[in-house]
């Protein structure tokens, strides 16, 4: 599975909420942060069909908005747990 990419803006409250969630759940080493202030990440986000942040690319699908991103990260976290 591809490493999920979190497209965000530093000054945006909803992006900050998602970044805090990632840190609080100790997923920093499992999620790639992509600041769309820079052309590379902005171009990659556009290439996935998006422009709004926060957004999460899971390798297959783009999830947009803090609630959708956190829900997808929770699902990925559940998949990574062993029984």
Model-predicted segments: where are they?
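Alpha-helical elements of the RecA-like P-loop NTPase motor core of helicases
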Residues: 16, 43, 71
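Local sequence-structure signature of Cys/Sec-based thiol-disulfide redox active-site neighborhoods
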Residues: 1-38
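A structure-centric signal for secondary-structure junctions around beta-strands
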Residues: 1-3, 50-53
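Non-catalytic, surface beta->alpha helical segment in thiol-disulfide oxidoreductase systems
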Residues: 57-83
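Thioredoxin-like thiol-disulfide oxidoreductase module
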Residues: 28-51, 57, 75, 79
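Generic alpha-helix structural propensity
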Residues: 13, 51, 64-68
């Amino acid at each position: 599975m591809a490493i999920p990419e979190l497209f965000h803006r530093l000054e945006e409250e909803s992006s900050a909420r998602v970044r805090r969630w990632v840190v609080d759940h100790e997923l920093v080493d499992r999620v790639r942060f992509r600041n769309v202030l820079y052309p590379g990440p902005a171009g990659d986000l556009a290439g996935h069909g998006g422009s709004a942040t926060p957004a999460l690319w899971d390798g297959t699908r783009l999830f947009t908005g803090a609630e959708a991103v956190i829900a997808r990260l929770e699902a990925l976290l559940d998949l990574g747990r062993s029984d």
